[in-house]
């Protein structure tokens, strides 16, 4: 049987995965052709009671990569009307990703986790842009799982009957300012808070630790 205190660790809670909340703002829906314009990551930590909390935040405005497509409707949606404005303080994809990955690896190691995993709202979208940008930058040591994610749209649909981020947050008893929405920084912070709320409420309801949790079912080396 797994020791109760050991079960109340980030490593054991997510089978060796280190969850990192991500949100991106983009100039379209195609990760291969459309520009990545903003990215934010929030790491998570678990306290001695096994409750999950947001930890570190890292955020960048990003320069469109050379030849990137910029959909007018997407720019109007995000409010990033001029992606090339020097007032944005944007950095290259390469710089943004390397800094994020440096933080993720440091905190993943401190948590004794084997691999990072992306948490996002409609996670396939954010995951696809992160992976496409990593490939463009020829980054070989990407800390995130190549396809697995935790999707808060799915989880909040199960927990609260809502899949839209703003509605899910409000149903969960959280504040959500629609005027701040579609900023990667704000949306990541709210997604992190939502994910922590879902995980912590499930624990409070008795869903974790598992009653019959043996080591054969918790192989941290098997991360597929």
Curated annotation (Swiss-Prot):
> Positions of the site: Important for substrate binding and specificity?
29, 77, 125, 147
Q: Please report a single Pfam family linked to this protein.
A: RNase_T
Cofactor requirement = Mg(2+)
Binding positions for Mg(2+) 2 per the UniProt entry: 23, 25, 182, 187
Cofactor binding: number and manner? Binds two Mg(2+) per subunit. The active form of the enzyme binds two Mg(2+) ions in its active site. The first Mg(2+) forms only one salt bridge with the protein.
Extract the NCBIfam families matched here.
Answer: RNaseT
Q: How does it assemble?
A: Homodimer.
Q: What is the designated name of this protein?
A: Ribonuclease T
Native source species: Vibrio cholerae serotype O1 (strain ATCC 39315 / El Tor Inaba N16961)
Gene name as annotated? rnt
